């Protein structure tokens, strides 16, 4: 099965002068203190879930966790299993039961301290409600993960996030799906559940930077509930899918049938998003073409000072993406371009179709078993949203992130990352768009076990 999720989340992840405004480093002392801790703290020995199941090192599948190597990509394409997977199941004498000897569980924990240039500003009034030049973002995320084969052709995966970005007291399932690698002997693979549409291109969870692939978030092609079918066709791989199009945060009671009925709606309309990707290797380069058509809520009435409210209309959107990547086992290069068209989107100009473009390019260099270095350049152009006095002027992005990771162990690393914002601040009278710089300096730890 050429599973489109080219990642291993149980071992992974996944936010100057006139031009480069100086970081506000009022908390530089604690930051330096944490760096000292990172450089001199003892490493912790731990074995992530897939490594634990098969008794292998994380380096079998990862060039540097969570970045996959070629073996790791093949492991994912083989429906998240090795040929010896049955050696790790209970011998019950029942040919129709394949239970793991133990429930396969893993944890990923991230803890940071971070200096910020951005703050929490009300786009309607310009009031700064929350402003911290540095803080302890710890834990930044705790993620519980599990995955295993259930039969010769069926596997499952889920990931539950606890305390993501300070949301303490919550448990949120971001990925949860069941996959089949050969439906009815057709060679067609299927994934049913909720997952990220953008994983067809570059899984956000396997990036080495703390900074995100911003274009995916702004285009709305991350988490959805749906189904994906995929198949190899000669040298190419084709993936097609359908999703609800309303994310994974909300469900709706189906109370029309009577009092306190158990049925629940996971979508609030009949429109669905249709998406797909065709990919192929051209020499050493992996490339693909992505497309999506679907619906989204309109951008509502423009309130005083430019604050944009959520609209009530359903409007059409289309996304076209081109992705390319390649590596030699030590240097990994990747790039993504997205073209977005949002038809009749703004309620104050409902007859106008608007478009914007965005993407990123990046490089990961595995210098040694201990050190990796990464660059990630995010760029987006608001185009037709420029001058609309709406929050969508904030699509405009121009940042460069530089990251160094030190591996205490295969599965425990320290990270230092600086994000440089090259987008000029918007000094117009409204309070939307790029009102402050978004640079930061981040230090922390990332561990999977």
Give, region by region, the residue ranges found by the protein language model.
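Bacterial N-terminal signal peptides
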Residues: 27-38
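N-terminal secretory signal peptides that target proteins for export/translocation
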Residues: 1-23
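Outer-membrane beta-barrel pore domains
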Residues: 130-131, 176-180, 284-449
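Sequence/structural segment immediately N-terminal to covalent heme-attachment motifs in c-type
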Residues: 47-57
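Short Fe-S-cluster ligation motifs
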Residues: 85-106
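The canonical Cys-X-X-Cys-His
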Residues: 55-65
């Amino acid at each position: 099965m050429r599973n489109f999720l080219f990642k291993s989340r149980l071992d992974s992840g996944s936010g100057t002068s006139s031009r480069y405004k100086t970081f506000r480093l009022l908390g530089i002392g604690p930051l330096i203190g944490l760096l000292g801790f990172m450089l001199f703290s003892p490493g912790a020995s731990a074995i992530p879930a897939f490594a634990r199941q098969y008794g292998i090192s994380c380096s079998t599948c990862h060039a540097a966790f969570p970045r996959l190597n070629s073996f790791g990509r093949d492991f994912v394409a083989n429906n998240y299993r090795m040929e010896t997977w049955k050696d790790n199941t209970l011998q019950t004498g029942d040919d129709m039961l394949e239970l793991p000897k133990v429930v396969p569980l893993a944890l990923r924990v991230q803890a940071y301290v971070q200096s910020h240039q951005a703050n929490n500003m009300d786009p309607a009034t310009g009031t700064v409600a929350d402003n911290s030049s540095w803080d302890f973002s710890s834990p930044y995320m705790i993620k519980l993960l599990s995955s295993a084969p259930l039969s010769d052709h069926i596997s499952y995966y889920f990931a539950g996030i606890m305390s993501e970005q300070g949301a303490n007291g919550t448990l949120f399932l971001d990925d949860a799906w069941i996959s089949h690698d050969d439906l009815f002997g057709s060679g067609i693979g299927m994934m049913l559940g909720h997952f990220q549409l953008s994983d067809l291109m570059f899984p956000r969870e396997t990036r080495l930077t703390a900074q995100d692939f911003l274009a995916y978030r702004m285009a709305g092609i991350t988490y959805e509930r749906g189904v994906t079918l995929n198949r190899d066709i000669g040298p190419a791989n084709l993936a097609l899918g359908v999703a609800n199009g309303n994310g994974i945060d909300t469900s709706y009671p189906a109370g029309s049938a009577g009092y306190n009925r158990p049925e629940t709606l996971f979508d609030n309309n009949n429109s669905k998003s249709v998406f797909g990707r065709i990919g192929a290797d051209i020499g050493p380069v992996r490339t693909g073409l992505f497309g999506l058509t679907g619906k989204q809520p309109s951008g509502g009435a423009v309130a005083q000072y430019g604050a944009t409210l959520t609209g009530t209309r359903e409007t059409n959107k289309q996304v076209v993406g081109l992705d390319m990547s390649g590596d030699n086992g030590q240097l990994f290069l990747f790039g993504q371009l997205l073209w977005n068209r949002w038809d009749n989107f703004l309620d104050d100009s409902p007859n106008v179709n608007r478009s914007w473009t965005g993407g990123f390019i990046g490089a990961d260099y595995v210098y040694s078993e201990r050190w990796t270095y990464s660059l990630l350049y995010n760029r987006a152009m608001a185009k037709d949203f420029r001058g609309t006095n709406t929050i969508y002027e904030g699509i405009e992005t121009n940042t460069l992130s530089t990251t160094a990771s030190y591996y205490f162990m295969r599965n425990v690393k320290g990270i230092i990352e600086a994000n440089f914002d090259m987008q000029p601040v918007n000094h117009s009278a409204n309070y939307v768009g790029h009102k402050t710089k978004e640079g930061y300096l981040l230090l922390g730890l990332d561990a999977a076990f």
